[in-house]
Amino acid sequence: MLVWLAEHLVKYYSGFNVFSYLTFRAIVSLLTALFISLWMGPRMIAHLQKLSFGQVVRNDGPESHFSKRGTPTMGGIMILTAIVISVLLWAYPSNPYVWCVLVVLVGYGVIGFVDDYRKVVRKDTKGLIARWKYFWMSVIALGVAFALYLAGKDTPATQLVVPFFKDVMPQLGLFYILLAYFVIVGTGNAVNLTDGLDGLAIMPTVFVAGGFALVAWATGNMNFASYLHIPYLRHAGELVIVCTAIVGAGLGFLWFNTYPAQVFMGDVGSLALGGALGIIAVLLRQEFLLVIMGGVFVVETLSVILQVGSFKLRGQRIFRMAPIHHHYELKGWPEPRVIVRFWIISLMLVLIGLATLKVR
């Protein structure tokens, strides 16, 4: 929005030309989202407390979590607000990739909001019925994936980039829709499962979004895309603005979500952020890179799948509790130790993922 305004004002003052620089807009996008989150935080927490929108804690969970009962939840609203405002201010509104991310972000946020509302207001511990949650998540994911396929079939936009191989980029055809669906829905649920400890989900999200900001910049730059042997996508550059907005909003939220948390993001935040990371990976043709950089989310999800599968097939559990972060809690690890070690692992995985862009 401000970019368009600056383009009209540059003829009166050349200084407005700075708005055309992607790096400048990326920095101010991050700062805008950060300041909005920091400003909204105390007000959001006070309002949630007034409404008695407190966290519901499982009775079969770790005893250390019982003290979290009643902590304000649905703080993801401030994350989404900060991201959307920042992106609308600093990204080119004509860019289709930006709108794809916003559709998934807001759509999944609405689904998460309904789920949280049923839990905290109606006191329904199960929240939104699972089949309806997955139905609406699927509708959004398939809708966006199908639109992208129609717009980009037979172009690099529907190729699959395989790490470590320069020239292995098969054209997916209709399988692109199926892959995009699983990546978007899967990542949304993976971040949701990870969001079980104070700050555990938000920092890996920040790391992955920061990594994708670099990838988006390279993918939208013809010279760097050619140098790294990745598809050049002319709309990809504006995703840098989206990614830095996620980083800024995430850091602002972490200010209040760090141990001991003053507020939780709830499903409204975790589903939305996960869906956003998923669609960004799809748009950049870096689904494999998401698996590497988002390895913490992958392991958390696999731990749940293995736990459920093992119990149904053998009647035995692999972990003391799933997702796996609860396993380490029950082993005696203090919550801050689990959180920080998962952060360190996440940062390492993002760096490894970025390195794969060159190791080909």
Curated annotation (Swiss-Prot):
PROSITE patterns: MRAY_1, MRAY_2. It is an enzyme of class 2 (transferase). The keyword Repeat does not apply. One of its GO terms (biological process) is peptidoglycan biosynthetic process. Keywords: Cell cycle, Cell division, Cell inner membrane, Cell membrane, Cell shape, Cell wall biogenesis/degradation, Magnesium, Membrane, Metal-binding, Peptidoglycan synthesis, Transferase, Transmembrane, Transmembrane helix. Its EC number is 2.7.8.13. Its cofactor is Mg(2+). It is found in: Cell inner membrane. Residues 1-18, 91-96, 157-173, 221-238, 285-287, 358-360 are periplasmic. It is a multi-pass membrane protein. Replacement of Mg(2+) by Mn(2+) restores only 10% of the activity. It catalyses: UDP-N-acetyl-alpha-D-muramoyl-L-alanyl-gamma-D-glutamyl-meso-2,6-diaminopimeloyl-D-alanyl-D-alanine + di-trans,octa-cis-undecaprenyl phosphate = di-trans,octa-cis-undecaprenyl diphospho-N-acetyl-alpha-D-muramoyl-L-alanyl-D-glutamyl-meso-2,6-diaminopimeloyl-D-alanyl-D-alanine + UMP. Pfam families: Glycos_transf_4 (PF00953), MraY_sig1 (PF10555). GO terms for cellular component: membrane; plasma membrane. InterPro entries: Glycosyl_transferase_4, PNAcMuramoyl-5peptid_Trfase, PNAcMuramoyl-5peptid_Trfase_CS. The chain crosses the membrane at residues 19-45, 77-90, 97-113, 134-156, 174-188, 200-220, 239-251, 271-284, 288-299, 342-357. One of its GO terms (molecular function) is metal ion binding. Homodimer. (Microbial infection) Interacts with Enterobacteria phage phiX174 lysis protein E (via transmembrane region); this interaction inhibits MraY by blocking lipid access to the active site. Part of the YES complex composed of 2 host Mray molecules, 2 viral lysis protein E molecules and 2 host SlyD molecules. Catalyzes the initial step of the lipid cycle reactions in the biosynthesis of the cell wall peptidoglycan: transfers peptidoglycan precursor phospho-MurNAc-pentapeptide from UDP-MurNAc-pentapeptide onto the lipid carrier undecaprenyl phosphate, yielding undecaprenyl-pyrophosphoryl-MurNAc-pentapeptide, known as lipid I. Belongs to the glycosyltransferase 4 family. MraY subfamily. This is Phospho-N-acetylmuramoyl-pentapeptide-transferase. It comes from Escherichia coli (strain K12).
